């Protein structure tokens, strides 16, 4: 069975179990890291922020061998990379929407969310968001359309849309690159 041999092919190894729970968890954050890094290849510089919705990451990743099938189970959708540009005031609203959802997969961001799902504090790359500054966000097309309770993600000033680069392909490439360098997967890029 060709499909079985393809899906069972080992492409890497994880040193740790990675879950997908709110408000924060390893696997969605790692996927957000991969999106953020991919923006560097596409746009010439790593995005300030990476965002993936918890619903886009469908299952956990167990410690041990990672197969092609595991990656398809984790990322079953054909979501494509989008690199979006926002003013800080809109990025602040996005962070407030994420807080109301009690967290999503994030990269480049530190945030404190209250038990009432209110944003108490946020930093991008270790600094407060400046309303007039311009920020880049690497995410997926589904979220760039303002879906999944984050309408402000659809209010970008500029965008680079890469339908040829799905989040699954990017994550697979990341896992294979790590394996080629004899680096097992940990919870952050």
What are these regions (language model features)?
Residues 1-13, 117, 123, 133:
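Binuclear metal-dependent phosphoesterase catalytic core
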Residues 6-22, 73, 150-155:
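Acidic/histidine-rich, surface-exposed loop or edge segments in extracytoplasmic proteins
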Residues 25, 29-189:
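Feature captures C-terminal
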């Amino acid at each position: 069975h060709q499909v079985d041999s393809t899906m069972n092919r080992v492409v890497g190894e994880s040193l740790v179990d990675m879950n997908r729970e709110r408000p924060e968890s390893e696997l969605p954050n790692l996927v957000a890291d991969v999106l953020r890094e991919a923006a560097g290849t596409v746009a010439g510089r790593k995005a300030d922020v990476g965002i993936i919705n918890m619903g886009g990451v469908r299952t956990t990743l167990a410690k041990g061998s990672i197969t092609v099938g595991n990656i398809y189970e984790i990322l079953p959708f054909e979501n494509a990379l989008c690199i979006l540009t926002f003013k800080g005031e809109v990025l602040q609203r996005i962070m407030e929407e994420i807080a109301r959802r009690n967290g999503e997969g994030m990269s480049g961001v530190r945030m404190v969310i209250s038990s009432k799902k209110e944003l108490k504090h946020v930093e991008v790359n270790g600094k407060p968001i400046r309303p007039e500054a311009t920020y880049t966000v690497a995410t997926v097309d589904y979220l760039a359309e303002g879906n999944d309770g984050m309408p402000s993600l659809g209010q970008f000033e500029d965008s680079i849309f890469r339908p040829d680069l799905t989040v699954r392909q990017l994550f697979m490439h990341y896992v294979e690159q790590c394996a080629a360098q004899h680096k097992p997967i940990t919870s952050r890029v």
